Amino acid sequence: NFMRRLRSYTQELKPDFALIGEVLFGDYNIIVNDEMLHSCTNYECYKGLYSSFNCMNMFEIAHSLHRQFGSDQWCIYRGKHLMTFVDNHDVTRLASILTNKKHIPLAYGLLMGMPGIPCLYYGSEWAEPGEKAPDNDYALRPCFEEPKPNELTEFIKKLIRVRQGSDALCNGAYKNVVIQNHQLVFERCSEKERV
């Protein structure tokens, strides 16, 4: 009952306050609903993102995206905006987990095009490496003296601007169009536009 009380309390203080939780597995609907959290981390799609590029099997992420956000009645998170990410404070950074570093911009392109609320982990916008260790996460949480912007940073900025200007990318339905091992084409469609 704590989450329900927290949601009610925060909405009284600030109606547009968003509650986002970290949920590693299970049915996100149990905690992401009109009475509890507004959103939570989407670990299923996180795993599908890097794994699809490492195995060159776009069927994996396409399956997860359709299962979660497709238009079929059985799709489980239609209309929800889960927090999507390519890395965070608990997992090996994208620059360290991808076997082909040329796929880093592609992974960000997919992140910004898929349903959800894209979240960037500090330092990853310039491809900072960092591997999760069995006994600590220090490599995932470095202290930077200053930012290290590069071409990837500029590319991600462009993707963010495109997403911000697109109702379909922010709120639209999801539909797989073409799925091959090395290619994934999907459609995002809202009442205002189709991408």
Spell out what each predicted region is.
Residues 41, 86-87, 175, 180:
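Intrinsic-disorder/low-complexity regions
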Residues 69-172:
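Active-site-proximal substrate-binding groove within the catalytic cores of carbohydrate-active enzymes
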Residues 36-38, 80-81, 89, 139, ...:
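Sequence-level motif detector for i,i+2 pairs with an aromatic at +2
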Residues 177-195:
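Carbohydrate-binding surface patches
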Residues 9, 16-18, 81-83, 117-120, ...:
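Beta-sheet entry/capping signal
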Residues 1-76, 110, 129-158, 188-189:
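Active-site-proximal helices and loops of the catalytic beta/alpha 8
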